[in-house]
Design a protein with these regions (language model features):
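Active-site acidic-Proline motif in GNAT/NAT acetyltransferases
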Residues: 59
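Hot-dog-fold acyl-thioester-processing enzymes
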Residues: 1-49, 108-110, 114-121
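Short alpha-helix capping/helix-loop boundary micro-motifs
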Residues: 52-56
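HotDog/MaoC-like acyl-thioester-processing domains
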Residues: 62-63, 72-121
Length: 121
């Protein structure tokens, strides 16, 4: 099956909580972006997100982090695709403008989602 990966810097403007924490919806939004590319590559259409299942928030995401978000198609129906998602922190912002590459990336969020695409013509 197909996998697509995006990397994204988390801007400080997205921090909503003490310790520069970013809400979990940020990663879910990135899952939508990477799912869109999956649909374009497979079907030539952006598709629509139908549902999420088994969303797990495993580690914090903070402003200044760099996330690697991957979508892997695990099932293809006639008009639906089941996709496994992971959001991994690969760099962590530190004080000021400093940041460091993590020796061991941290899995922050996992989920399974279903997208639907138009019927083939």
């Amino acid at each position: 099956m197909i996998s697509v990966t995006h990397r994204r810097y988390v801007p400080y403007s997205h921090a909503h909580y003490a310790g520069h924490l970013v809400d979990g919806a940020y990663s879910l939004g990135l899952f939508g972006d990477v799912a869109t590319e999956v649909c374009i590559r497979l079907d030539g259409d952006e598709g629509l997100f139908a549902s999420y299942s088994d969303v797990q928030f495993k580690a914090p995401v903070r402003a200044g982090d760099v996330l690697e978000v991957t979508a892997t198609v695990t099932r293809m129906g006639t008009r639906s695709r089941t996709i496994d998602f992971t959001s991994v922190v690969v760099c962590r912002g530190t004080d000021g403008s400093a940041a460091s590459v993590l020796d061991e990336p941290s899995v922050a969020v996992t989920a399974t989602g279903t997208v639907v695409v138009p019927p083939r013509r």
